Amino acid sequence: MHLFYLTILAAATFIWGWIFYKREYHPQPYKVIAVSFVAGLLTMLPVFGYKYVYVHFFPHLSEIRILEPLVESAFFEGLLFFFVNMLIVVSILTVFSGLTSLMLTLFKYETLQNIKNTLKDGEFEYVTMSSMLALLIFAERLLEESLDVSILHTMVGVIMFLAIIEEYVKHLTVRFIDDRRIKDVDDAITLSIVVGLAFSFIETIIYAVNTGDMAIVLPRALLTMPIHLIASGIFGYYYGLAHFAKPITAAEYKEKKYRIRFKWFHTVLRMKKSDVYEEEKIAQGLVMATLFHTIANILFELDLAFITVPLIVAGLMAITYYYKESHFIYRLLHKRAKLK
């Protein structure tokens, strides 16, 4: 019976992956897809590593207690403690993800370079993750104080925190393993989806084993798995835009399609236009992927799983749109390259 459910889960994973693999303009070699999938299976190790650290050494970093300073302390004091704790969590996840990627690739030099490049750009992602949670908790505190309404900030905050961790770890895996294999934007989407599917695959197996209910594989293959692939695909699209920030900003700025704020924003920050664009897209991808994942998880917690169906349909339509946009960007950039 267990083999039956495992076969169904494997088949669902393959079908979901094949659907989006065939949407690629220039599909990646099967070997690259296989390595990405194995890397996705191992993304649970950084999550387990984080849990091991807070269980045995730093209990204040758990998904519940890490939010306590925002709820119980004065504004600035709570914000300071929370940001410090989040910095520790991000560091733990990055270290475990880096070690996992290095072991998988047998300490390949390319992986070391990918990790080095990611560490250079990690501060904006850390600020984005921390700010999302802080704004959520403070908004709920404000509503509680002004409207005298009791809000389950802990539940919502914990769900968002866990969604952030999962999306961030999956994203790190793509950057550490596949960064230099990305030749166009749709590569980033596909490789992110593959990692997301692998994460969902191993998560479902662990969940089924822990609960002793293998039948849970069926609804998770139809509902939870697409949630993961959509969230990963969203992040992958924006990461793809960030990856090609230099040619994209050059094309858009020259054709006067670029957004007005970059005419002064990059000057204020003393950053190149392409660097500002890159950081913005990474942050945008993280926010959108996390919000999508969080909304879906809240619906599951409230036993409103049926509402996730239209959410999944909308998400799949968005991923299809992202592929079309990535193909347009590919043609635009290659056309400009030929004209040079």
Each language-model region and where it sits:
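Hydrophobic alpha-helical segments at protein termini of multi-pass membrane proteins
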Residues: 1-340
